[in-house]
Amino acid sequence: MEDDGKSPPDSAYGEPKKYDPNFKGPIQNRGCTDILCCILIVLGIIAYVAVGIVAWTYGDPRKVIYPTDSKGQFCGQVGTPNEKKPFLFYFNIMKCASPLVLLQFQCPTTQICVENCPDRFLTYLSVATTQQNFDYYKQFCRDGFNNFTKSPVEVLRDRDCPAMITPSKPFTRRCFPAINTQKGVVMVGNSTTFDDGRGDKQRNVTDLLEGAKKANVVLEARQVAMKIFEDYTVSWYWIIIGLIIAMVISLIFVVLLRFLAGIMVWVMIVLVIAVMGYGIFHCYMEYARLKGQSGSDVTLKDIGFQTDIRVYLHLRQTWLAFMIILCILEVIVILLLIFLRKRIMIAIALIKEASRAVGFVMSSLVFPLFTFLLVCLCIAYWAITAVFLSTSNEAVYKVFNETQCDFSGNTCNPETFNTTNVTRVCPDATCQFAFYGGETYYHKYLIVFQIYNAFMFLWLANFVIALGQVTLAGAFASYYWAFKKPDDMPAFPIFSSLGRALRYHTGSLAFGSLILAIVQMIRILLEYLDHKLKGADNKCARFLLCCLKCCFWCLEKFIKFLNRNAYIMIAIYGTNFCTSARNAFFLLMRNIIRVAVLDKVTDFLLFLGKLLVVGCVGILAFFFFSRRIQIVQDTAPTLNYYWVPILTVILGSYLIAHGFFSVYGMCVDTLFLCFLEDLERNDGSTERPYFMSGSLQKLLNKSNQTKPDK
């Protein structure tokens, strides 16, 4: 089978590589490249460390973890006066129903830290008059309140104590009324009404309910989050077991590819078709089973969004949609296999060659762990710095008032507030902790530091990935260009390639990752603008933004593709980034047919391998967590949403499979570029023999001439 695969000659894409008798693979004698970018990334890292030090100096993560009282003090923080008071108590939670809550995210009522939430109905008037339960009531008064000679009216006026307390339960470290329903009637404790402690008529419990809802605007979202968190706490070890199974399957698959590449690829293709076929069969059986059942004919549009995915599984339309999607995917895969069957044979040969290369460079299978750990380090540094930056603001106090007040919302000082004229003009006004901010030079530029933190994270993460790619490329290129394998290969190909990359090409890797980081940062800013403009009526702006997002998405994909091939050229020839990118692009364009078909076919086959691993583990997780495996039915944990661990296992399995198959992907890409250069440099003669394996030569109808016997 002859496979020319070249595009017509075009000088615009340069001349084919000429034969060089001295070329034996990755060049050893090379110099430093893109030194300016190397200096830039070093300076960037120094500045990044400086930003981190400043953030860690001024930041305080306690502001995220612990609630704060009206004085800005933390509740439950070890080493503070409130160490034994972990819960936040609202003097009058009904005031949280004020629209100010939605504008300023703070209730216009006094808030203190308490040891326990109240468990009974009491009013200050009743305890002050009878002295019963007074010691219990005092724990809900301001710290230091001991002037028992003050009249109840003065105590309530000065907000020394709450007018009433109600049975409450802690939620997210805050005391909320213990509201429940009995036979559809809203109650708190065992009552539907309560005394507000101000001598007014009995108030309805629904007033408390309204205040509690506004006190926590995201109460329902937090409840869902808490349920998801609970699911993780009872299923985390099963999730880990599922991920271990995915790792074992991926490892077995990669090892089998090493020895049985051709058979494994065809087995993989058949299994993918079989798995999707079973999915279609299962969806049809569920669709047929639900026929005639009450409520199963409700449409997805009518039922709307539900957090419990089990609701959707009782609808026939859900299983019909799944079946249609799987049928479309099945047809697409089968058609691709039919039309690409000839190219698949060449792709299998390339995968076989990649398997041999991995066999000679076995350390390449564990090298992605090094890259993974470095990426995790980048993520950890970015996340910690972001938290410290976001919590490095100072406590800001604002004027809060129940009624209309000209000073409402102004900044105030709680130490001197009672001596100002604000209390004379607005007697009900209070100076309370509002949020964390600041007016200093540092606080004004916090957003700049956050943007720099995000940008440096993208730059360093892309740099680490680039380092991994160029290291693997150098190792696999040394395999391909070794005429006598493994005699002509270095003793430690991975370490040799890593050393060359760090010593000579840090600047080139920084250059490529910088370009990619800039494009990714622009995409993030466009997403932010899109989020801000969602409520806008300007359709022209929305359309323009959508076009920009699409263009930069395509640009990012192209740059990733170009960078990947440029790193291969850097690993082989030691040229700078721009030269390597140009040479790689021209080489690919001179062989555009092979690139468009052969290289993408191998990517498709490797993707099927990932799909097979994810499909096997995903189906197993679905049957286990939905309690459909009789043998281990009692072992499966009881969950609020069983899709939570299933989706986690599926996502984790894909990342694990991607980690293992990425080695093969980089190996295939490297061998592919070497393969193209081999065809351009050599012709199979005794003077210019091919470096490709005998199986590839046979498949392409190429051969090396042997020297005639004398």
UniProtKB/Swiss-Prot annotation:
One of its GO terms (cellular component) is mitochondrial outer membrane. Glycans are attached at N147, N190, N204, N401, N418, N421. Disulfide bonds: none annotated. Keywords: Antiport, Cell membrane, Glycoprotein, Membrane, Mitochondrion, Mitochondrion outer membrane, Phosphoprotein, Transmembrane, Transmembrane helix, Transport. GO terms for biological process: choline transport; ethanolamine transport; transmembrane transport. It is found in: Cell membrane; Mitochondrion outer membrane. Pfam families: Choline_transpo. PANTHER family: CHOLINE TRANSPORTER-LIKE (SLC FAMILY 44) (PTHR12385), CHOLINE TRANSPORTER-LIKE PROTEIN 2 (PTHR12385:SF34). This is Choline transporter-like protein 2.
